[in-house]
Amino acid sequence: MELTYKQLEATLAAYLNVHPDKIGTFRSRMKQLQRLEFPAGVNIGRGVRMTYTAEHLLQLAVAFEIIGTGLAAKSATDLVTKYWERFQAAFGRANSRLGYREDFETFVCLAGQPPVAREGSNEEIVSVHDLTSLTEQVLCFPRPEAAARAGMQILRADYLLERVNRLAGDVGQVRSPKWSPEYRAWSKKRDEDQQLWDYADGGPPVPF
């Protein structure tokens, strides 16, 4: 998928349901992310002559979702950048499953971090789930005796992806956004090397 800045802005504004009276506030937030050098490798801003990709669009959509929960912009963009491989795997799975319209529910779980860093802390701050693993491994926790914290955010990756693609086509006038080769590449990468933090589809094969 290739977008101009105008298409990127229009798609994100529609995704976030930005009221026309608030478009100036939205653009100010986009400039704030530019100052944070997010997404990495691009210079977000009106009039910048460059091409944006599905990855840039989705990184911004995810960051805005996290910022919307009250997390500071710097913390949100740092989290998306650090764990982008995990979001990428979720979108790759969602894309392939949406094509078959079955078992397409794909979730990214963002677990609460301890206020004070500790040795051996859980690295699975961001994990990928299907409906089964979300129910069995996330929604049933934390047990009172478990060490896990109660705070978490669950992002519906399949819904986000499908909505962004639809708006990129309808509002941004991007041609065939859902057929972006990036999505197929992410899906293929996940299929070939599913990681331990990816619990969907029964999790990665256990080596013997």
Each language-model region and where it sits:
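Alpha-helix N-cap/helix-initiation sites
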Residues: 19, 23-26, 45, 50, ...
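Polyanion-binding surface elements
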Residues: 1-32
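Short secondary-structure capping micro-motifs at structural edges
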Residues: 46-49, 67, 94-95
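Basic amphipathic alpha-helical segments that dock to polyanions
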Residues: 30-36, 52
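A short, Lys/Arg-enriched interface patch at domain edges and termini
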Residues: 55-81
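Short helix-start
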Residues: 42-62
